[in-house]
Amino acid sequence: MGNKQGKSPNNSKGGKKYKIDNDVVKQLQESTNFDKVEAKKLYEVFYDLSNGGKEPLNRDRFKEGLTKLESCGLKNLDNSPFGDRLFDLLDTNKDNTVDLQEFISGLSILCKGTAEEKLELSFKAYDIDGNGYITKSELSQMFQQAWISGFKALSYQTNEEVNKDDLNNFSEEMAQIFADGAFSSLDVNGDGKLSFNEFKQFAMSHPKITATLNGSKRDVPITFD
């Protein structure tokens, strides 16, 4: 990763003792939109997830620790269409691990970024192959995850079980309808892909999808909000 993570933090959480490196915290604060308290908190979360900095923060360990980010003011990302993509977005050097700088810089956009920065990050989430455009298949995949996360949240909220096959089939159908609608109105040159500006236009006019279950409703944003 090539990133200096500083000395091991000194914390008493869970019996672990980490020594906080205030110089590193200051550096992270100055290079992101976080204040000192927020940068320190995320510094601690990172070291908790990486076993005190002794183990690389890989995809599995990152996903297991998503709920810890709620204490930092982030929403429940493990129940969102972006949970699986967030690791890829933070891993900017594509070495299949997330270092401290990548971790906090990426979360800085999610927590404190401008609307434009969040839209750009959302575009990258949809652009699964990273070629700078979104295909109908990529758009449909992310829309399907949005529907699935909405229905899962409703199922938990209402204590009603949802058949997995029915959920997948319905979510796939709705995602295809939304993707077809987006490309029909935005892909005017018929090249089968959306640019960032075209995606932005759609996201601003259709900021969410709404899942319904026996009278209950759940809105799911289609971008980082």
From Swiss-Prot:
<keyword id="KW-0519">Myristate</keyword>
<keyword id="KW-0479">Metal-binding</keyword>
<keyword id="KW-0106">Calcium</keyword>
<feature type="lipid moiety-binding region" description="N-myristoyl glycine">
    <location>
        <position position="2"/>
    </location>
</feature>
<feature type="binding site">
    <location>
        <position position="189"/>
    </location>
    <ligand>
        <name>Ca(2+) 3</name>
    </ligand>
</feature>
<feature type="domain" description="EF-hand 1">
    <location>
        <begin position="78"/>
        <end position="113"/>
    </location>
</feature>
<feature type="region of interest" description="Disordered">
    <location>
        <begin position="1"/>
        <end position="20"/>
    </location>
</feature>
<dbReference type="GO" id="GO:0009966">
    <property type="term" value="P:regulation of signal transduction"/>
</dbReference>
<feature type="binding site">
    <location>
        <position position="133"/>
    </location>
    <ligand>
        <name>Ca(2+) 2</name>
    </ligand>
</feature>
<feature type="domain" description="EF-hand 2">
    <location>
        <begin position="114"/>
        <end position="149"/>
    </location>
</feature>
<keyword id="KW-0677">Repeat</keyword>
<dbReference type="GO" id="GO:0005509">
    <property type="term" value="F:calcium ion binding"/>
</dbReference>
<feature type="binding site">
    <location>
        <position position="193"/>
    </location>
    <ligand>
        <name>Ca(2+) 3</name>
    </ligand>
</feature>
<comment type="similarity">
    <text>Belongs to the recoverin family.</text>
</comment>
<feature type="binding site">
    <location>
        <position position="138"/>
    </location>
    <ligand>
        <name>Ca(2+) 2</name>
    </ligand>
</feature>
<dbReference type="InterPro" id="IPR011992">
    <property type="entry name" value="EF-hand-dom_pair"/>
</dbReference>
<feature type="binding site">
    <location>
        <position position="191"/>
    </location>
    <ligand>
        <name>Ca(2+) 3</name>
    </ligand>
</feature>
<dbReference type="InterPro" id="IPR018247">
    <property type="entry name" value="EF_Hand_1_Ca_BS"/>
</dbReference>
<feature type="binding site">
    <location>
        <position position="97"/>
    </location>
    <ligand>
        <name>Ca(2+) 1</name>
    </ligand>
</feature>
<feature type="binding site">
    <location>
        <position position="187"/>
    </location>
    <ligand>
        <name>Ca(2+) 3</name>
    </ligand>
</feature>
<feature type="binding site">
    <location>
        <position position="131"/>
    </location>
    <ligand>
        <name>Ca(2+) 2</name>
    </ligand>
</feature>
<feature type="binding site">
    <location>
        <position position="95"/>
    </location>
    <ligand>
        <name>Ca(2+) 1</name>
    </ligand>
</feature>
<feature type="binding site">
    <location>
        <position position="102"/>
    </location>
    <ligand>
        <name>Ca(2+) 1</name>
    </ligand>
</feature>
<dbReference type="InterPro" id="IPR028846">
    <property type="entry name" value="Recoverin"/>
</dbReference>
<dbReference type="Pfam" id="PF13202">
    <property type="entry name" value="EF-hand_5"/>
</dbReference>
<dbReference type="Pfam" id="PF13499">
    <property type="entry name" value="EF-hand_7"/>
</dbReference>
<feature type="binding site">
    <location>
        <position position="91"/>
    </location>
    <ligand>
        <name>Ca(2+) 1</name>
    </ligand>
</feature>
<feature type="binding site">
    <location>
        <position position="129"/>
    </location>
    <ligand>
        <name>Ca(2+) 2</name>
    </ligand>
</feature>
<feature type="compositionally biased region" description="Low complexity">
    <location>
        <begin position="1"/>
        <end position="13"/>
    </location>
</feature>
<feature type="domain" description="EF-hand 3">
    <location>
        <begin position="174"/>
        <end position="209"/>
    </location>
</feature>
<feature type="binding site">
    <location>
        <position position="93"/>
    </location>
    <ligand>
        <name>Ca(2+) 1</name>
    </ligand>
</feature>
<dbReference type="InterPro" id="IPR002048">
    <property type="entry name" value="EF_hand_dom"/>
</dbReference>
<protein>
    <recommendedName>
        <fullName>Recoverin family protein DDB_G0274781</fullName>
    </recommendedName>
</protein>
<feature type="binding site">
    <location>
        <position position="198"/>
    </location>
    <ligand>
        <name>Ca(2+) 3</name>
    </ligand>
</feature>
<feature type="binding site">
    <location>
        <position position="127"/>
    </location>
    <ligand>
        <name>Ca(2+) 2</name>
    </ligand>
</feature>
<keyword id="KW-0449">Lipoprotein</keyword>
